[in-house]
Amino acid sequence: MPKPVIAIVGRPNVGKSTIFNRIVGERVSIVEDIPGITRDRIYSAGEWLNHEFNIIDTGGIDIGDEPFLTQIRQQAEVAIDEADVIIFMTNGRDGVTAADEEVAKILYRSKKPIVLAVNKVDNPDMRSDIYDFYALGFGEPFPISGTHGLGLGDLLDEAANHFPKIEEEAYDDETIRFSLIGRPNVGKSSLVNALLGQERVIVSNIAGTTRDAVDTPYSKDDQDYVIIDTAGMRKKGKVYESTEKYSVLRALRAIERSDVVLVVLDGEEGIIEQDKKIAGYAHDSGRAVIIVVNKWDAVKKDEKTMKAFEENIRAHFQFLEYAPIVFLSAKTKKRTQTLLPVINEVNESHSIRVQTNVLNDVIMDAVAMNPTPTHNGSRLKIFYATQVAVKPPTFVIFVNDTELMHFSYERFLKNRLREAFGFVGTPIHIIARARD
């Protein structure tokens, strides 16, 4: 099941981004200095007690020079469209404003659960002023302070009470779930239809015509699949035309439910910045990844074109160096038959478990080939390694000092593991841990 989504909505200057940052904390910080991985502050993962969720800050939408109330309306529409629960943010210092009432009218019609938050209640003396907010029609207002972090626990408790009940998906463990993600009109739905051999998903040359994520069970050569097709961005309202940020929302929710993620590119148009952003989310998820170049039939080419395009992909997506690249045409169905075997291969790699003795032989051979680094006269010592997880393969390496594990040496060890065990299409995680 995808994680529930909370949207924070409200007029400007009520502190939406401050509350967003308070809730997500360090989870939005960039931990890898790799080109192409952009953590978008408008959307992030959050956690409260035993609840995991995704959260949207609608204040991050760049509307441009639109009139004030139009901006508010567009932000509210995004929240209504995407969220399971909406936190309606107001400002306790200003009281109820006409703009708050405008937001309330829109949200009241949404029939989504609304939790009313009154921000900037920074001291107990201000609590008596929040009762005016009952007039907005959303029940008890929750006083909070983004500056001091006060009241967020009660607010999140109330939001979590409205999360959809989690239901187990009716697919067995042998079923491979894969999603197709990419910007609008790269041919995701056409590719689904090419695989299925039928017009199962509505397809149009208008970008964003797939209405939502669609699950399609599918079997081929005794292997069961579930295809999760996502719209890149719905054609609904000017807000979707004016920002690309929300194109990742459905992709992210589909990624959470996938074993394998297909990042679909438009071979005719080439690579743009939004492709890199979406691919970065695929990498960050830890899922197996395949890069699919669609519309290859429309590309003027010679014997060098494919190699040049592949080199361009590798240059732009350095963080996906492990992902195989498949060139095809959903329209003509050329090379589409090559896709499922690659999906099977990367899914298998994603689940590889290596015996501890074999793993340690490979690690020690790597150390003999390329001695561990030193820093300030101290040398990194590797004692032993063990695999602690699959999907993705995750290894703990016990060392004398974790600070001595330089990222370049970690990358060297990852490359040696790939050479030894394959790991096609899957990221590898290495955790350095000091031995007690």
UniProtKB/Swiss-Prot annotation:
CDD domains: EngA1, EngA2. GTP 2 binds at residues 182-189, 229-233, 294-297. GTP 1 binds at residues 10-17, 57-61, 119-122. The keyword Membrane does not apply. GO terms for molecular function: GTP binding; ribosome binding. Keywords: GTP-binding, Nucleotide-binding, Repeat, Ribosome biogenesis. PROSITE patterns: G_ENGA. Residues 4-167, 176-351 form the EngA-type G domain. InterPro entries: G_ENGA, GTP-bd, GTPase_Der, KH_dom-like, KH_dom-like_a/b, P-loop_NTPase, Small_GTP-bd. Gene3D superfamilies: 3.30.300.20, P-loop containing nucleotide triphosphate hydrolases. Residues 352-436 form the KH-like domain. GO terms for biological process: ribosome biogenesis. Associates with the 50S ribosomal subunit. Belongs to the TRAFAC class TrmE-Era-EngA-EngB-Septin-like GTPase superfamily. EngA (Der) GTPase family. GTPase that plays an essential role in the late steps of ribosome biogenesis. This is GTPase Der. It comes from Bacillus mycoides (strain KBAB4). The gene is der.
